[in-house]
Structure formats: C-alpha cells, structure tokens
A protein has these predicted regions:
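Intrinsically disordered, low-complexity terminal regions
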Residues: 2-252
Length: 252
C-alpha cells in the first residue's frame, strides 16, 4: 500500500485562497438599523427616522406651550370630546381653530373637522402632557356637545334655539349665553355648569353621581337616578323633575 503525504490544512487553505476562523467563534452578523418613513399630507415622504425602541416609551411634554392656527373650513355643529383636552368655543376667535400644547407634542395633536363634527384623533396613552391640550375656535356656536372620559368643554356666549349636552364619565361642560331648549344627559360623575346660560325650557337626565347647575325660566323636567344633584335657578313655573335614590333637586 502506497502512503500519501497529506498537506497541512493551512497549506491547503493558502493554496485555494481560503480564510479560516477558529471553530469556537460564532460569526457576528451586524443588523442594519430599521427605518420608517414619515409621510406628509398627500403621501409624499418627508423624512426617514429610526423606529422607536419600544411602543411603551413615554413622550413627556416639554412644558413650553406652543400654538398652531388652522383655518375653520366649516361651521362646528357638534363637538366629540373623547381625548383628554379642553375644547373652548369663543365667537371672538373668528373663523379659525387655535391648538395649544407642549411644543414637542404639538405634531401629535390631530384636529378633525368633518361634516360639522369637531374632534381629536386618539393619542398614545404613554404621552404625558405638561401644557394641557386646548382647542379654541369661533364661528357659529355648536349645538351638540358629547363628552366621554375626562374632557372639558367651555362654550361662551351661546345663542341658539337648542343646546344638547351628553356627558359619559367625569367630563365637564361650562356654558353661558341663552337658548330656548336645554337638554342634558349625564351618566357617571360628570358636571354641567350653566348658571349663566338662560334657558326657557330644560329636560334633564342624571344617572350616577353627576351634578347640574342650570338657569331655567319656564319649564324643567326629567329624572335623577343615583346620588347626583341638580340646582335650578330662574324660578321656572313648571317643575317636573323626579328623583330616586339619594339624588336631589334644589330650586333657588
């Protein structure tokens, strides 16, 4: 039997131009950083930025207030407040919408006005405001106010045939002005303050621990269930408020 001379492994590697690494080392693969494209209105990419490391990361407000002015393209007939913010109607503002927020949160505040409905797009629960978000607008007064959660709506110098207010949660509404018909429906611990709103007639419904202060001149009716309270001024001639539980109505 013939004997073959084996070339050393290093000689073979040199012969074929191979590069060997130690067997006990694991090859290291460097992953490229993920990117995301930020789209402007209309779909054009405006910048490329790294994806945040975690969706649970908090965005903390800077404490520096900034304002943004938007055109009021149509009258606001209804306000849907389901985001933690304050909505203020003030006719002296004119035909525009003014958004106030922390300067580093301003671009997260998305105002929507479609078919007369004004609202804010949902925001991340991890966002921490230092400057309360405030939406102020003018033009015609809204006729429907719908609040969910802890939002607040302020209406100044209301003038209209009817004002409808619905509060679900711990939100608050503050109104002054005058109206023929006032309709209020509260479920939860919300509050309606209308001591400076002169209403000729009012229909009230409270379920839970909500509170109402209203001024009614002619007629007030409705029902109170739970532990809520209603204070009525204006000395209405017709009083048809009924209550169950510990709820009470007080006339001043």
């Amino acid at each position: 039997m013939k004997k073959f001379n084996l070339l050393p492994i290093f000689a073979i590697s040199a012969l074929f131009g191979l590069t060997l690494t130690a067997c006990d080392k694991t090859p290291q693969v460097q992953a490229s950083a993920p990117v995301t494209s930020t789209m402007a209105v209309g779909g054009a990419p405006t910048s490329v930025a790294p994806i945040p490391p975690s969706s649970s990361a908090s965005l903390i407000g800077s404490g520096v207030a900034a304002t943004q002015t938007l055109p009021l393209s149509q009258p606001v007939k209804r306000v849907v407040a389901d985001v933690s913010a304050t909505f203020i109607y003030d006719p002296s503002v004119g035909d525009k919408i003014v958004v106030t927020a922390d300067d580093n949160i301003q671009n997260q505040v998305k105002v929507s006005l479609e078919q007369g409905v004004l609202k804010l797009a949902p925001m991340a629960a991890t966002m921490q405001q230092k400057t309360p978000i405030q939406i102020t607008w003018g033009g015609a007064a809204p006729e429907q106010l719908d609040i969910m959660g802890s939002s607040k709506v302020i209406v100044r110098q209301f003038k209209g045939n009817a004002l409808n207010a619905t509060i679900s949660g711990s939100g608050a509404i503050d109104v002054d002005g005058q109206t023929q018909q006032l309709n209020i429906d509260i479920s939860g611990s919300g509050s309606f303050v209308g001591a400076q709103l002169v209403a000729q007639k009012a229909m009230i419904k409270v379920t839970g621990s909500g509170n109402i202060v209203a001024q009614v001149k002619q007629e007030v009716g409705g029902s109170l269930t739970g532990s809520g309270s209603v204070v009525i001024s204006g000395n209405p001639k017709i009083r048809n408020l009924t209550s169950t539980g510990s709820a009470q109505a007080v006339y001043q």
